């Protein structure tokens, strides 16, 4: 371990603009000044020593004039001073003056003030000189019997540290602390003592635990946490001890502390795979989620449940707890609800699906009673999708779900209604026995649908699946009801003319004289300038859509009318009724065409819609068998093929997931028998406490050896040239929310460099956490400097700066070496993600920042280029593989990713291969990127451009 990686106990900010004081003035202040002057002088001495100054002449002055003072501030500063001051001669012998200091330590350990005693004991933990500690051992032991817990607590820490570093000074420390632990009543003191026994003498710790194992529930939470850690470590090293302590872990699941319950549940899962243990741990996790108010805690504990589910044996146990898991839905947070519903959906089985559906139906009804809110709408969507998935997996449930959900087709939230419509469309295609029910419910809610998009979908479903004469007639009745009086143009003109008559009568009323700015008279009519028209909400729905200029729904209506008319002709034998029905359908289409060509709608009808309606009119007028097949058979087959492809894709993805989860055992793998296994081979699992500690320190071990490109050497950035007086290079370590720069600084000169400081600045959404402290470099010496940079969002960031230093003995100004820029790669923060087509389109419409990147590459294959973009941007392709397979000269695909900060990134790849340029022609086209923030859109665009340059080389 290098000096830079050692734990640093003292961090003091140094004002850079102040002039360093001389040793003579400091000596004068320390000898003759008052308490305030001595305090300031001592602070300056500490700062100078930290900056590399030796100041040996001041040591005796401080011992004579400062050490005897009883001022608490000075005593605190002295503890810092004695920690950093050199205590040995160059040959390693202890300075004679330190004997006087040792006596001062002894007096402080016997001081009547408990704070001075405790802080002195804490300071002794940092001493590395055995000669200084040896005379103090009796006083340290005596502190174990002090009346105040603060002193006793720190005495235990001091004894533990001394025993760890210099066992010969206190060889009986474990026995001493064990006796102390037996008689101690304070929770913090017991915790420290027990922690020492865990690391110093584990057998004594286990003996103590065995004597009080039944009282563990009465202990404080800090001691309970340490007990959980001990049991985990003992059972991890020696699995035969599990039976001895597992009851204790079970008891700790009932602790009043949430932290203890969480750790105990995690330990129980690692120690035992018995169904009762897994069930108890899972139940504990569920209780924690429900009772804890912090949503972050809820999400963390939910992740533990998801991890349990990944184990095939544990999954069966969790299936019995689905209803308990659903209690978490009482949490108002959307993210928690989303994760809970996904977990419940993964665990649902034929045994509990009925209960699950009942709960979800109640939740759906609840959302209807809650005042409208963005999260309420999104929660309703989640519930609808979950019920949709349940119905697809368990068809028997669909009949219970459909009537409740179809009420939401008339919902004002279009997204929720669209999810219901998608579900209904799939259900009516898959389940023949439910078609009558769905058509009946659809006709009930049809008139109440408010959204034109939902109206179009409902029209299509009714036109496709109404198979009886009565249903067809009902559809026609609903369409006529929704369209209002026809012909539309004439009726609208009549209405306007009818509304003008009373207004004309009003104009005869009194006239008020007004004086204008010019001094002339003006008259004001009682008739308002904008004549009142009939309120739009009073219009029938379909009529309102058409008058608003939305004629796409008219094209959909024409198709529906054509389908039901052709079907009616096939069902009814009477020629008169056939002609009457077909004529009515054609009349509706004709009146819509007439309306589209008039000036009444806000927007005129488009040519595409005119062509579609005209085509339908022609089909009805001719009634050929070919057109009959296309309208009544081919349309339904296309839906069936789409749903089959979707289902096949879902099954494939589920199969891949299950293959990942299943642990494959090779035929020649050895079988482990506990009775025949050596102790050091007994458990192949990694120590969870050690892993979490490494993760917290940023030292997580990654499998880098297999991939040389992912090794640390690949992330080393050279900051200066080899000919510069100071050479610097940095290893960029990217964590989840921060970046650690480990900078190697080498003095390449023959001079001593003083106040050598790494000055950094950032560009983008990066923030330097703390300024690296200055250091002194001997000739040809080197040092490591670590700097933390906080990352707040996914943007391309740049870290730049310089190294400034003074040359020892030179009178020149400060020297400066400019560093090369460090570019932070946003790919470390972007992860592939999935979303539905509807969500993608919704986000595409909402996101305001777009970056259009032109394709510039020498890649000749469309699919190869797409794979290259996916690899370069770390995005996931949402377009199914079947849609991308084959060759047709062009390709369009949607890509999606999320950052660890929750930012969404969308991309649409639209590329083609020019046929006229031959088979070796390069791919052309463009990529459109959309994001909520400008930085995200620009950063991804830059990344794509950079990757294209590499492929073009």
From Swiss-Prot:
Question: Sorted alphabetically, which InterPro entries does this protein's record hold?
Answer: ARM-like, ARM-type_fold, Clathrin/coatomer_adapt-like_N, Coatomer_bsu_C, COPB1, COPB1_appendage_platform_dom
List cellular component terms (GO).
Answer: COPI vesicle coat; COPI-coated vesicle; cytosol; endoplasmic reticulum; endoplasmic reticulum-Golgi intermediate compartment; Golgi apparatus; Golgi membrane; Golgi-associated vesicle
Coiled-coil portions:
none
What UniProt keywords are attached to this protein's entry?
Answer: Acetylation, Cell membrane, Cytoplasm, Cytoplasmic vesicle, Endoplasmic reticulum, ER-Golgi transport, Golgi apparatus, Membrane, Microsome, Protein transport, Repeat, Transport
The post-translation modification note in this UniProt entry reads:
Proteolytically cleaved between Ser-528 and Ser-529 by CAPN8.
- Tell me the residues on which N-acetylthreonine occurs: 2
Gene Ontology process terms (BP): endoplasmic reticulum to Golgi vesicle-mediated transport; intra-Golgi vesicle-mediated transport; intracellular protein transport; retrograde vesicle-mediated transport, Golgi to endoplasmic reticulum
Which Pfam families does the record cross-reference, listed alphabetically? Adaptin_N, Coatamer_beta_C, Coatomer_b_Cpla
What is the membrane topology noted in the UniProt record heading this document? Peripheral membrane protein
Q: Name one GO molecular function term.
A: structural molecule activity
User: Where in this protein does the record say N6-acetyllysine is found?
Assistant: 494
- Signal sequence coordinates: none
* HEAT repeat segments: 96-131, 132-168, 240-276, 277-314, 316-353, 396-433
The cellular location(s) given in this protein's UniProt record come to: Cytoplasm; Golgi apparatus membrane; Cytoplasmic vesicle, COPI-coated vesicle membrane; Cell membrane
Further information? Brefeldin A induces dissociation from the Golgi of the beta-COP and presumably the other coatomer subunits.
Summarizing the function annotation, the protein's role is: The coatomer is a cytosolic protein complex that binds to dilysine motifs and reversibly associates with Golgi non-clathrin-coated vesicles, which further mediate biosynthetic protein transport from the ER, via the Golgi up to the trans Golgi network. Coatomer complex is required for budding from Golgi membranes, and is essential for the retrograde Golgi-to-ER transport of dilysine-tagged proteins.
Subunit comment for this entry?
A: Oligomeric complex that consists of at least the alpha, beta, beta', gamma, delta, epsilon and zeta subunits. Interacts with SCYL1. Interacts with CAPN8. Interacts with COPG1. Interacts with ARF1 (myristoylated); this interaction is required for binding of COPB1 to Golgi membranes. Interacts (via trunk domain) with ARF1 (via switch I region); the interaction is direct. Interacts with KCNK2 (via N-terminus); this interaction increases the channel-mediated whole cell currents and promotes plasma membrane expression of KCNK2. Interacts with PRKCE. Interacts with STX17. Interacts with TMEM115.
Q: What protein does this entry describe?
A: Coatomer subunit beta
Please name the gene that encodes this protein: Copb1
């Amino acid at each position: 371990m290098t000096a830079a990686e050692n734990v640093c106990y003292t961090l003091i900010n140094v004002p850079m603009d102040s002039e360093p004081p001389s040793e003579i003035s400091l000596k004068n202040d320390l000898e003759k000044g008052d308490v305030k002057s001595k305090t300031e002088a001592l602070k300056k001495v500490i700062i100078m020593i930290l900056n590399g100054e030796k100041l040996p002449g001041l040591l005796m002055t401080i011992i004579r004039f400062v050490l005897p003072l009883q001022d608490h501030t000075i005593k605190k500063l002295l503890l810092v001073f004695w920690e950093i001051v050199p205590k040995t001669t160059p040959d390693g012998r202890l300075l004679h003056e330190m004997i006087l200091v040792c006596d001062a330590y002894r007096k402080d350990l016997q001081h009547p003030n408990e704070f001075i005693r405790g802080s002195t004991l804490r300071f002794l933990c940092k001493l590395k000189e055995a000669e200084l500690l040896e005379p103090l051992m009796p006083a340290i032991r005596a502190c174990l019997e002090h009346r105040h817990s603060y002193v006793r607590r720190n005495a235990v820490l001091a004894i533990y540290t001394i025993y760890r570093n210099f066992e010969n000074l206190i060889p009986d420390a474990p026995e001493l602390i064990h006796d102390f632990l037996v008689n101690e009543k304070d929770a913090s003191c017991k915790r420290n003592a027990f922690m020492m026994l865990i690391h110093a003498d584990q057998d004594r710790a286990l003996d103590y635990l065995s004597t009080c194992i039944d009282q563990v529930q009465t202990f404080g939470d800090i001691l309970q946490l340490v007990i959980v850690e001990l049991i985990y470590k003992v059972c991890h090293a020696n699995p035969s001890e599990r039976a001895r302590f597992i009851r204790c872990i079970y008891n700790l699941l009932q602790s009043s502390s949430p932290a203890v319950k969480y750790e105990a549940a995690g330990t129980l899962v690692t120690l035992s795979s018995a169904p009762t243990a897994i069930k108890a741990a899972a139940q504990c996790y569920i209780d924690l989620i429900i009772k804890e108010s912090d949503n972050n805690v809820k999400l963390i504990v939910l992740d533990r449940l998801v991890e349990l589910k990944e184990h095939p044996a544990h999954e069966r146990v969790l299936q019995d707890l689905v209803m308990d898991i659903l209690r978490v839905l009482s949490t108002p947070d959307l993210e928690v609800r989303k994760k809970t519903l996904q977990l419940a959906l993964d665990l649902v089985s034929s045994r509990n699906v009925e209960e699950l559906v009942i709960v979800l139906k109640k939740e759906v009804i609840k959302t209807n009673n809650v005042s409208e809110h963005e999260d309420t709408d999104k929660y309703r969507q989640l519930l609808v999708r979950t019920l949709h998935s349940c119905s697809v997996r368990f068809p028997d449930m669909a009949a219970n779900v459909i009537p409740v959900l179809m009420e939401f087709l008339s919902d004002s939230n279009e997204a929720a209604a669209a999810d219901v419509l998608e579900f209904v469309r799939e259900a009516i295609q898959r389940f023949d026995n439910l078609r009558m029910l769905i058509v009946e419910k659809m006709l009930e809610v049809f008139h109440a649908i408010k959204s034109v998009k939902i109206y179009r979908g409902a029209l299509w479903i009714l036109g496709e699946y109404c198979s009886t004469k009565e249903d067809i007639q009902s559809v026609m009745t609903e369409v006529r009801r929704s369209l209002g009086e026809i012909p539309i143009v004439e009726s609208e003109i009549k209405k306007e003319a009818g509304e003008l008559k009373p207004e004309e009568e009003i104009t005869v009323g009194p006239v008020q004289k007004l004086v204008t700015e010019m001094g002339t008279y003006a008259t004001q009519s009682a008739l308002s300038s904008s004549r009142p028209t009939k309120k739009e909400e009073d219009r029938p729905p379909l009529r309102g859509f058409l008058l608003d200029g939305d004629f796409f729904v008219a094209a959909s209506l024409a198709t529906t009318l054509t389908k039901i008319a052709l079907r009616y002709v096939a069902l009814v034998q009477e020629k008169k009724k056939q002609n009457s029905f077909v004529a009515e359908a054609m009349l509706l289409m004709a009146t819509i065409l007439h309306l589209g060509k008039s000036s009444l709608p806000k927007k005129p009808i488009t040519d595409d819609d005119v062509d579609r309606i005209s085509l339908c009119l022609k089909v009805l007028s001719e009634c050929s068998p070919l057109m009959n097949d296309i309208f009544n058979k081919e349309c339904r087959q296309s839906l069936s093929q789409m749903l089959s492809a979707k289902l096949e894709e879902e099954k494939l993805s589920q199969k891949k997931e299950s293959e990942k989860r299943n642990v494959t055992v090779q035929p020649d793998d050895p079988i482990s028998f506990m009775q025949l296994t050596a102790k050091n081979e007994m458990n192949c699992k990694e120590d969870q406490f050690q892993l979490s500690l490494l993760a917290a320190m940023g030292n997580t071990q990654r499998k880098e050896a297999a991939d040389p490109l992912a090794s640390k050497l690949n992330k080393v950035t050279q900051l200066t040239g080899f000919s510069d007086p100071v050479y610097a290079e940095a290893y960029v370590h990217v964590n989840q929310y921060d970046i650690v720069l480990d900078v190697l600084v080498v003095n390449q000169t023959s001079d001593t460099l003083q106040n050598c400081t790494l000055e950094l600045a950032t560009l983008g959404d990066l923030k330097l956490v703390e300024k690296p402290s200055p250091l002194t470099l001997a000739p040809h010496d080197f040092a490591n400097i670590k700097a933390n940079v906080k990352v707040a969002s996914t943007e391309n960031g740049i870290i730049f700066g310089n190294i400034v230093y003074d040359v020892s003995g030179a009178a020149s100004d400060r020297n400066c070496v400019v560093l090369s820029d460090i570019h932070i790669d946003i790919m470390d923060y972007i992860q592939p993600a999935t979303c539905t087509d509807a969500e993608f389109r919704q986000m595409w419409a909402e996101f305001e920042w777009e970056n259009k990147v032109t394709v510039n590459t020498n890649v000749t294959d469309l699919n190869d280029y797409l794979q290259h973009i996916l690899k370069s941007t770390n995005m996931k392709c949402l377009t199914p593989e079947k849609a991308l397979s084959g060759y047709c000269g062009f390709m369009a695909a949607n890509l999606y990713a999320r950052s660890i900060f929750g930012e969404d990134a969308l991309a649409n790849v639209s590329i083609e291969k020019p046929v006229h340029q031959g088979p070796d022609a390069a791919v052309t086209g463009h990529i459109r990127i959309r994001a909520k923030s400008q930085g995200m859109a620009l950063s991804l665009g830059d990344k794509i451009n950079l990757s294209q340059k590499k492929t073009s080389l």
